[in-house]
Design a protein with these regions (language model features):
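A short, N-terminal "cap"/entry segment at the start of jelly-roll beta-barrel domains
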Residues: 1-43, 127-143
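Short, conserved beta-strand element in jelly-roll/cupin
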Residues: 46-50, 61-79, 118-121
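Short beta-strand His + acidic residue motifs that chelate non-heme Fe in jelly-roll/DSBH
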Residues: 56-58, 79-80, 97, 102-109
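Short acidic-glycine-tyrosine-enriched beta hairpin
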Residues: 83-99
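A short hydrophobic beta-strand segment most commonly corresponding to one strand
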Residues: 96, 110-129
Length: 143
């Protein structure tokens, strides 16, 4: 999906370049926070990935509760848990990621992609950023 088509579908908007987390991504991503952390404990943001962009393997740790929910909103992308096959993502799909599961997500090679990222509240939560998804791993997924 090209950028012009994507922008028509991406109802939550591109947001700003995701510079604070750029070191954990291959390619460019954008962040549009939808909730104000000063007003609620539930953080929701629209995350947009340019074609080929993906985040590093990472883990949302929690003693209890925690994890992340991805709600796919535009374009097409990938989600993969360690040791499992990648899942092709399209608008309307919801991925529930339990706490303490190593995973990554991002755009397909030839498509922009966005999802809402919902950080699930929990006890003693933290994020651990791990190694990048290699080009070899990513290229095996195809289009």
């Amino acid at each position: 999906m090209n950028k012009q088509e994507f922008e028509k579908e991406n109802v939550f908007g591109l947001g700003e370049p995701n510079v604070n987390f750029a070191k954990y991504f291959i390619g460019n991503s954008y962040l549009n926070p939808l909730t104000d952390m000063n007003k609620t404990s539930l953080f929701i943001a629209n995350v947009t990935f340019e074609p080929g962009c993906r985040n590093n393997w990472h883990i949302h740790h929690a003693k209890s509760g925690g994890g992340q929910i991805l709600i796919c909103t535009a374009g097409s992308g990938w989600y993969q848990e360690e040791g499992k096959d990648a899942i092709s993502l399209t608008p309307g799909m919801v991925i529930t990621i339990p706490a303490n599961v190593k995973h990554w997500h991002g755009a397909k090679k030839n498509s922009w992609f966005s999802h809402l990222a919902v950080e699930v509240p929990g006890e003693e939560t933290s994020n651990e950023w791990c190694e990048p998804v290699t080009n070899e791993e990513y290229d095996r997924l195809g289009e």
